[in-house]
C-alpha cells in the first residue's frame, strides 16, 4: 500500500490514504468496477450536472478523443518521419506531418513542434533554447496571472534560470512597458515572457519586441489560455506582432487533447527547439495525441473564427450580468475584458478558492486567480471564470443572466448552495450537444 507522505497537507493526505487502503484490499475485478464507476462519475459531473466556468478546461470533439484510443499511441516513434529508428511506422509518421502542417496553418506559423507533453514543458523548452542555468528571464507576476511554470518553483526555476518578476500595470493587467525597458537594460534577460493564466486586455507585444531586440533577448508568448482566440482571430496575433515563439496548451480554449505545442516563424528558434525535443527532452512520444491534435485542427479550420468570437461575446455578456447581480467583477470600470476570461474580486467572500468551493456545492465549477489587489491570507484574491466550455455546449449571451443569478444567489447568501444545485443541474441539462464540430 502507498506510504503516507508527511510533506503533503494533512487533509488531502488523509483522503488519499483512505482511498489507497480501500483499493489495496480489493480484487482486480472490484478495482475495475471502481475504475469504470469513477470514469462515469467524471462524465456525469462535467456533461450533465455542472456548469464548468474554468477556462483551463474544455470538451473535446469525440472524433479527436477517439484518436487517443486508436492504437497509435502505443507505437514508439523515435526520429524524423522518413527515417524512424523503429520499423513499421509508415502510418504514424504521416500522422505527425499532417498534424504539424495543420497546426502551422491554423496559427499562421512556419514551424510547429508537437513533441511537447504539456504547456508547462513547452515553457521549459522555450527557456532551454534561450538561456542557460544562472541566466535571467523576465516573467509575469502571479499578481497578473503569471503561471507557476514561469517562476522559481516551476519549470524555469527547476531548469536553473533566474525568474525576474516584471513590473506590471494593474489597470491594464499586463506588463508596464516603460519600467520593463529600464529593468531590461539593467538586467539583460535572455527571454521576456508575456501571456498569463488570466488575460483581460491586449499585451504590448510589439513594444516588448523592440525592447528585446535592443538587448538581444527572445520574446516568448505563453498562449496556454489564449490559443483558441488566437487560432480564431479574436485576439492579437503574437507571431505577427513580434513574439519569437508561442507556447500552447492544447486542451483549454483550443478544445483538444491534453498536452502542449510550440509554434514559431523563426528558423533558428525552430532549430533549437528541434534539438531540445530530440534527442534532448523526448525520445519516443505519444503519436495518438498528434492524431487527436490533427482532428482538432480540422474543427478550427472550419469553425474557428465563429467559436472564438462567440467565446468573447459570451464572456462579456456573462461578466456584465454578474455586475448587474451586484457582484464585484474586476476591472468593471475599464470594460472588464476583451477575452473569454474575467475575474470576480474575492475579498468580500473569504478568497477565490473559498468561493470556488462554495460554488461547487451548487454544481458550478470555477477556480481562484491572483489579482493586483490586497492579498488574502491563506487564499488568492480573485475568482477566475471563462466561457470556452459553456459555449462549446451551446450557451450564448442570452443564457448568461440566468447563470449569473445562480452564482449571485450562492455568493451573496440569498440561498444555500445545496438549494440552488437542483435548479443549476436542470438548466445544465438543457445544453447537451457539443457545438463547432465538423
UniProtKB/Swiss-Prot annotation:
Molecular function as annotated in GO: glycine hydroxymethyltransferase activity; lyase activity; pyridoxal phosphate binding
GO cellular component: cytoplasm
InterPro entries named in the record: PyrdxlP-dep_Trfase, PyrdxlP-dep_Trfase_major, PyrdxlP-dep_Trfase_small, Ser_HO-MeTrfase, Ser_HO-MeTrfase-like, SHMT-like_dom
Reaction catalyzed: 2-methyl-L-serine = formaldehyde + L-alanine
Regulation acting on activity, per entry: In the alpha-methyl-L-serine synthesis reaction, activity is inhibited by an excess amount of formaldehyde (at a concentration greater than 10 mM).
SUPFAM superfamilies found in the cross-reference section: PLP-dependent transferases
Cofactor: pyridoxal 5'-phosphate
Biotechnology: May be used for efficient production of optically pure alpha-methyl-L-serine using L-alanine and formaldehyde.
PTM annotation (N6-(pyridoxal phosphate)lysine): residues: 252
Keyword Metal-binding assigned: no
Enzyme Commission designation: 4.1.2.-
Keywords: Lyase, Pyridoxal phosphate
Gene Ontology biological process terms in this record: glycine biosynthetic process from serine; tetrahydrofolate interconversion
Family (UniProt): Belongs to the SHMT family. Alpha-methylserine aldolase subfamily.
Assembly information from the UniProt record: Homodimer.
Job description of the protein: Catalyzes the reversible interconversion of alpha-methyl-L-serine to L-alanine and formaldehyde. Cannot use alpha-methyl-D-serine, L-serine or D-serine. Cannot use D-alanine instead of L-alanine as the substrate for alpha-methyl-L-serine synthesis. Does not require tetrahydrofolate (THF) for activity.
Protein name: Alpha-methylserine aldolase
Protein species of origin: Ralstonia sp
Amino acid at each position: 500500500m502507498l506510504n503516507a507522505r508527511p510533506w503533503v497537507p494533512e487533509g488531502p493526505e488523509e483522503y488519499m490514504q483512505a482511498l489507497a487502503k480501500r483499493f489495496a484490499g480489493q480484487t482486480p475485478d472490484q478495482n475495475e468496477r471502481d475504475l469504470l464507476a469513477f470514469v462515469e462519475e467524471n462524465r456525469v459531473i462535467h456533461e450533465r450536472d455542472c456548469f464548468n466556468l474554468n477556462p483551463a478546461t474544455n470538451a473535446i470533439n469525440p472524433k479527436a478523443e477517439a484518436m487517443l484510443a486508436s492504437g497509435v499511441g502505443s507505437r514508439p516513434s523515435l526520429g524524423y518521419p522518413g527515417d524512424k529508428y523503429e520499423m513499421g511506422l509508415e502510418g504514424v509518421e504521416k500522422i505527425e506531418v499532417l498534424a504539424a502542417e495543420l497546426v502551422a496553418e491554423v496559427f499562421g506559423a512556419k514551424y510547429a513542434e508537437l513533441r511537447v507533453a504539456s504547456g508547462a514543458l513547452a515553457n521549459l523548452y522555450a527557456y532551454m533554447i534561450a538561456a542557460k542555468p544562472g541566466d535571467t528571464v523576465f516573467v509575469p507576476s502571479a499578481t497578473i496571472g503569471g503561471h507557476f511554470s514561469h517562476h522559481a518553483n516551476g519549470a524555469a526555476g527547476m531548469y536553473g534560470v533566474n525568474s525576474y518578476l516584471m513590473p506590471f500595470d494593474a489597470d491594464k493587467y499586463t506588463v508596464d512597458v516603460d519600467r520593463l525597458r529600464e529593468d531590461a537594460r539593467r538586467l539583460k534577460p535572455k527571454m521576456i515572457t508575456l501571456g498569463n493564466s488570466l488575460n483581460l486586455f491586449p499585451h504590448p507585444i510589439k513594444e516588448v519586441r523592440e525592447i528585446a531586440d535592443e538587448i538581444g533577448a527572445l520574446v516568448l508568448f505563453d498562449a496556454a489560455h489564449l490559443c483558441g482566440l488566437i487560432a480564431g482571430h479574436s485576439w492579437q496575433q503574437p507571431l505577427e506582432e513580434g513574439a519569437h515563439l508561442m507556447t500552447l496548451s492544447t486542451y483549454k480554449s483550443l478544445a483538444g487533447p491534453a498536452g502542449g505545442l510550440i509554434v514559431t516563424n523563426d528558423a533558428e528558434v525552430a532549430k533549437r527547439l528541434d534539438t531540445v525535443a530530440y534527442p534532448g527532452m523526448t525520445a519516443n512520444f505519444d503519436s495518438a495525441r498528434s492524431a487527436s491534435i490533427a482532428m482538432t485542427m480540422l474543427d478550427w479550420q472550419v469553425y474557428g473564427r465563429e467559436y472564438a468570437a462567440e467565446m468573447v461575446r459570451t464572456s462579456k455578456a456573462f461578466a456584465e450580468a454578474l455586475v448587474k447581480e451586484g457582484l464585484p467583477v474586476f476591472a468593471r470600470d475599464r470594460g472588464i475584458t476583451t477575452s473569454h476570461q474575467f475575474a470576480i474580486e474575492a475579498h468580500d467572500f473569504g478568497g477565490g478558492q473559498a468561493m470556488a468551493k462554495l460554488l461547487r456545492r451548487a454544481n458550478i465549477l470555477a477556480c481562484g486567480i491572483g489579482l493586483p489587489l490586497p492579498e488574502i491570507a491563506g487564499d488568492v484574491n480573485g475568482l477566475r471564470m471563462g466561457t470556452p466550455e459553456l459555449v462549446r455546449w451551446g450557451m450564448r449571451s442570452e443564457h448568461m443572466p440566468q447563470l449569473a443569478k445562480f452564482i449571485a444567489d450562492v455568493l451573496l447568501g440569498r440561498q444555500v448552495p445545496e438549494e440552488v444545485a437542483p435548479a443549476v443541474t436542470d438548466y445544465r441539462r438543457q445544453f447537451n450537444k457539443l457545438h463547432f464540430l465538423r
